[in-house]
Amino acid sequence: MNQIEIQELTTHLSQALDQNYDVVNMDAVLCVICALEGTTITKEQLEATRLAKYINQLRRRTKNEHLARRAKSLLKKWREMVGIQQTATENLAHPSQISSSQPALDLVKSPITSFITEPIAPSQQIVSDLHSNIDSAEPPLSGEHTLLHPNFSNLVNSIKDSDRHENIAITTLHTHKDRRHSHSIRSCHVASPQPIVIDHSVNSVINLTDDSTVKINEASVVIDIASDSDENDNNGSLNPKKLNSIVPAPLPIPSTPSSRQRKLKKEKRSKEREGQVATNTRFGAKASDGFQQAALTTDSEIFSLSNSSMSSIVSGDATSSYSQNKSRLNSNELTFTGRFKAVDHLFRSTESGKHKIDEYSAYDSNASCSRLSPSTVDEVKKAEHLFDAQLTNTTANQIPMSAVSIGYESNTRHEYLESDSPSQIPKRRGRKKGSKGVDALIAKESSSLSQQIFFGGSTVKKVKTTKELFNEIQSRKLSVSMQSSASNLSNSSTNRDLPSHTTFPRQTSSCSDTSMNSPHILETLSGSAIFASKIDDLGNTDSDTVTSDPSHDSNKSQEIKECTSLDSNSNSIQSLPLANNRENLIPTNVNDITTQLMHLIHSLNSPLSEIEIERVYQEKIIPCTCIVIEGVQGTLGESNNSTLDEQSYNAKISLNSKDNLSCHNQDNYSTSQRSVNGEVIDTQPKLVKSIFDLDFDDNDDPLYFIMDEIQKPIARADELKNNKSDTKNINFGASAQNASLNIIHFNDDAQQDNSNQERGKNETQNAIPAFTVHEDPDCLARQRFYIQTNKVTSFHINALHNYYIPNINGNWDSVESFTSFQSEHTIMDTMESYTVTNGADVVPKYGLLTSDRIRKDLSSLKSIKPYRVKNFTSLISPFLGVAKCLPTCRRARRRFKNFVNSSTANDKISNNFESLENMKTSFKNCNPLNVKIDGTTSAIYSHNENHVPMQVNTNVEQLPPSQSFSSNAISYNLLKLADDKVCHDGISDKSSNTGCQGNSPYSSSSSSSYSGRKEDQHIITKNLQNKNIQLNSRKSDMKRRKRIYLENDSKKKKHYRKRIKTAVNRTFSNLHRNLYSIDSENGMKNDYKNEYGNSNNEEYAIVQRPAGDGENCSNHIVLTIKKTPSKINSPANSMTAFSPPSTSDGANLQKSILDLRLEDTNISQSITEIPQKKDLSKTDRIVHQSRSSAYRRIFRKPDKSQTKFIDLDLKHLFHLKANSPCISANAKLHNKLFFPHELSRDNTSGIRERLINYSSSSSSSYDDDSEVENTSFLKKANVNKFSASNNRNLKTETETCAATAISEFKFESDEDSILTSLGDSDIDIQDEIQVINDKVDYCNDFQNNKMLESFNSIFVDSLRTNTKNASDNMGSSAHITSLESLKPENADAITRYCNNNNLGVNLSNELSNISAKPLKSFDSTMKLPSLGIEHCTGIKTSSDMASTNIAEKKLTRIQQFKEWHQVLQLRSYNNEPLIVLPYVLLE
């Protein structure tokens, strides 16, 4: 019970008692005690309610022995529950007990004795009595029986008693009960057997006194705890003959049940005593009824032993006694189930239909199981009436046990009713010695038995949760059913098969341990046939709980079910189709559980589908019964009021007629209308507002007051005017009737005045439709609305977010309309057709109705998934989102300023650039997010800073500002992240190679590396650290690449400084290389951090707007994600970008991406043949260093054994820079999507700007990461080249290439000059550099500049191999030459880059490396595999690049892109571009 119920019981009890605790209302007291006996109670509840005090006082004050006994049993139970074990034992040997034992002897004499094939002891013939009832059997025929077989004889006796008490104190020899049983019908007063006290430890049934060592071979005693009391009652009425007939087969008694039996016996004895006394009183008065209730509750309690009853029965005592009993009785001999049933009770079950309706049924285990709700008084009374009927019938019907026990057993209410039992059975409040409160546990009284079993038996102080109960029930069902199934099947099953009820004991209520309390379980456990039979009764007697099986339901139980709903909590399912036979039940116990579970599962409804939900919803749609009344205010308030009143009245009538709407609103409305009196507008009743009505209430709406305030002054003015100019007043105003005229303001003031006045009147009087909603309080639609709106469940949310709803939540009209990446063209088309300019394009603004498609899946805006991607192991967690811009840009700008502050830097920058101001301007233009960085160096650093912002001054030790910076290059560097590290690590070499290559983007990277030399070194150090970290994690090949890279880094560091110095000394092309190297180093760094095989460095490219946009064009911060061309050709590879007007290549670049793709396709075809390294002859050396670098990169690519990276940006985002045609000759496939000339263009200041850093040139230049040394060398060369390019006219001497003079050239002429300037030595150097670059690129390809392998890199293994070989042949002088040649070309490219505000990625360098000649030679040497459409973008031919000759133009650039990440450039809210990348690695 819960606290409230306990409190109520306490209240009732207190009311039933007077101040002296004398019983005032015996019925109420008995009801309360029955309820308490049938329920569990917690210590806290007792403490809170002080219920124990009332019970104790009642026990002390009452003169009713039965009531006192029951109260005492309750207190015992509670003590045990509370943990206060009372060692005091009841004096079981009372004359009454002796007398009851005598009836037990009579029982033994009765055929029951015959029923017991073997007496447990010589005197164990009492077992036959057990069949009648344990209580009946309990009184041994002789004292020796009680002594010899205290368990069994006592069990029998106690069964009788228990029948009365529902609690079988089997543990104690109910000799006194036997004596009491002597009072029972068959009670033959044998010499009162000595009361045998059976320890609780010993199973009461099996506990035989030391005298009874013989096991009962007689028919196994099935002890049905639940039913024995009733059965005892019933059996008491029954003749021993029945017991004999019923018992024929020994019932298997599991040893564990025996312990329960003991406890039950004890409880039965004590409760029987109490019950007998109570029944004696009951027979004379309601006390008997109360006792019957108690007895009834006893059965129910036994089943309601949810917590302790069965557990107590099965407690250690039970188990220990079980072992003892086991020695005494075979498990087959004793069977405990639910309640102890005598075997005869099995037969009686048929009779039980007649009599089992008695009190016992009222006390069904189920009924008592729901201890929380003990059987109601009516139920108890009903049970009592049933019991009385049974008493009348029991004498004939019940087993001899009843005859034996009725005289004694309180359980045998029949005896009490007969009133011989009370006389025969002395009141015994004390426990027998050794009873250990088992009496309390198994008090025969239904309440005391169940409660004691619940509380005392197991001494369970804790109320078990439903889950615990269910688990225990199942486990017990399994164990008990499995254990007892064999024995029960063998013995008891046959006996119980007789009664269909017993076959399937009903499960007890959930309150009780179903397994233990369930009739079948108890029956299975019960060792006495009586118990078994009682189980049948239990089934019958169980209240209408689901647990009770109809098969078991006896008539009594069925009748009681009406009264007792307590068992409704029972876990068992009555409907389970179990055979009536206990055999069926036992073998199907496991199956029963499964069946029950299946029933439960099937009872659960499967979730409704959307269609079903919709259907249900449609079915549930209810028309709104609310009424909207349009109250048209008449011209006069009165008329309005009357109209409104009529309307409201009519509405009321209609509503009332419908009985749907309450009219009080209308009444109020009408009343308010009546009160309005022409002021209806102001005083109109408050309309019922719709939840959608956001307007003020009429009374609260300030509009009326505002209107009044406005109108009053107007009216006053009108009056004044009217007074002043009455002559001017016109009829128009006078016509108050004409609202329109009133409204119209005439030029005449008087007319206006009149109109205003009349207007105010008319406003109050004019018929303004007023819609009044009369809500029907019973409107189902409204209720549903409130319910649904107030109860938004996950279903609604999921429906909104996950379900496809056309035109809702951005869902497109059809699911099929969802666009995914379908083809190159479709990508560009979708990009163009569907533009994401701001968040509203993805997420509609609040309150904005968006009928257009809103992409919920922007995957189409992303590049194709790379075919092969290395496991991404990043030291830094990838940041998905907009590339970081401002902090980096600011840092870069500060660094640039710092660098620019140095006069040398300024001079160099001025030398390298037309003007530092131009650089700064372009750089500022290049600043992402319009972040103004005052120097290209800062941009370069920022380019390096993409991963780690780098200060040019810090990073660039000696790089001349011109070398280290171009505004575009700076801007490129500003956002280039991945490339920076690579630039430092691998790109420096690459850039040096590029420097040799001249136009190769390495030159820019080298310049970047120069600019970031210190930082490059720092980054390199970080990169090395990162690489070291990643080397550990990388595969052996990656480790090898790392080692190469580390070596390259170490070399790079050295060479970087040297090259940077040289670059500072004047190699602007080296600036490009430095840029590339920085980028590549950053990329390398990122590669180490981000381990994607071929992914090149991600870089934020500041995309300069086309020259047409002007210097002022805000830079686009683009994180260029490169994929190896082998990976995926994405239409983004060739992006519609403005080809820099500076070169014809730029025009080509201007082609749309599709054009570029076509062009690439054509290029792939034309490029099919690419001059190999052999082409990289001195002739090729003559080719610009960029060419040789490109070639070398190609060569390195084979070394790297990975596709080269192609820097990709959205074509439309990038203005391709045109590289000098020199690239065509030596050109190896450009690692980048665009050639330098494509990326560069002349800015407004005339400086060639890099339109975009669509790729981390460093990574592309590094595409071969094979050699970090090469990278470092390239970086030096790039530094030189970058410095040369910065200086344009200055010769760049790298320490490596110091001997070689690099031709001076201007940015504009860099590529051309490189083409012309490159000498054989340059070519050799380029080859060498290219080899280095190839190695670097190899590393980069694996490391991929921390970018995804899929990042673009041109892959021509054969070309790269040949190139690498040629580059290997090429000496440092060749590198120098390449650097020289690259310088001009790189300078141009860098200039373009800087002008483009790109991150100083000298694509032109690399592109220039792919000079037309080298390309031509490559073309002749090798054919690029013709690329399919997927690779069309991968191949680009820049005839402009190969301007030197037509062949070179054809071969000018071969770019093979197999995959790329499409970079989405969004226009930021300030109209500045934001680049959204699939992966943006931020440090």
Swiss-Prot record:
Residues 550-564 have a biased composition (Basic and acidic residues). Residues 496-518, 565-575, 989-999, 1020-1033 have a biased composition (Polar residues). Residues 426-435 have a biased composition (Basic residues). GO terms for molecular function: transcription coregulator activity. The modification Phosphoserine is found at residues 204, 258, 421, 551, 1177. Its main location: nucleus. SMART domains: TFS2N. It is found in: Nucleus. Residues 480-495, 1000-1011 have a biased composition (Low complexity). Residues 227-278, 414-438, 480-518, 541-575, 989-1041 are annotated as: Disordered. Belongs to the Mediator complex subunit 26 family. Component of the Mediator complex, a coactivator involved in the regulated transcription of nearly all RNA polymerase II-dependent genes. Mediator functions as a bridge to convey information from gene-specific regulatory proteins to the basal RNA polymerase II transcription machinery. Mediator is recruited to promoters by direct interactions with regulatory proteins and serves as a scaffold for the assembly of a functional preinitiation complex with RNA polymerase II and the general transcription factors. Required for activated transcription of the MtnA gene. Component of the Mediator complex. Interacts with MED6 and MED17. This is Mediator of RNA polymerase II transcription subunit 26. It comes from Drosophila melanogaster. The lineage of its organism: Eukaryota, Metazoa, Ecdysozoa, Arthropoda, Hexapoda. The gene is MED26.
